[in-house]
Amino acid sequence: MKFKVIFVVLLLATLSTPSAQAADTGWRYWGYFQAAPGATKWTAAMTGPTVNVEDGSVEGWAFTFSNDAIPDAKAPKVAPSFSSICGKTKAVAGKKRIGVMVDFGSSVLRPKGESTPRLIQKCVVADKSALGIDVLGQAVKVRAEGSGFICGLNGYPAKECGVEMKTPKGYIKK
């Protein structure tokens, strides 16, 4: 009986805690965030960039990391501000203005042999029917897989797409 109790306790402990291996590796990729008109905080986009983007909103992209132990991707470092990105861009009849921010992430995520580009903030004037991917494509050069998964923005990273990597030290939760 004692053996069965010890076995059950060990089994439950194994199933209830994330494995060290799951916390040791994760994925670096482009995270997608949105800020509705007037919002000052990022919201992780629960859909891909194939949604209609509202006039006055800000679209954010961040080269980020996550794994089982760190499920939430980091949003762009700079808070969304439509007025600071698009304040000097005049409204155009029949079009919409969208702020776009591209944060190329922490240097610990940088692929070997590449340089981390500077943050991009750009105001895009787009057709009223433009989707998030259309707006992004007006702001930067987009490289995507056939499935639509975003692999690179403005050539960063140069070749990889959603690569598995060891968890960077700064991301490990203590």
Where are these regions (language model features)?
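Ubiquitin-like/PB1-type beta-grasp interaction modules and other compact soluble beta-rich domains
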Residues: K2, P18-K174
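Sec-dependent N-terminal signal peptides
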Residues: V5-T14, A20
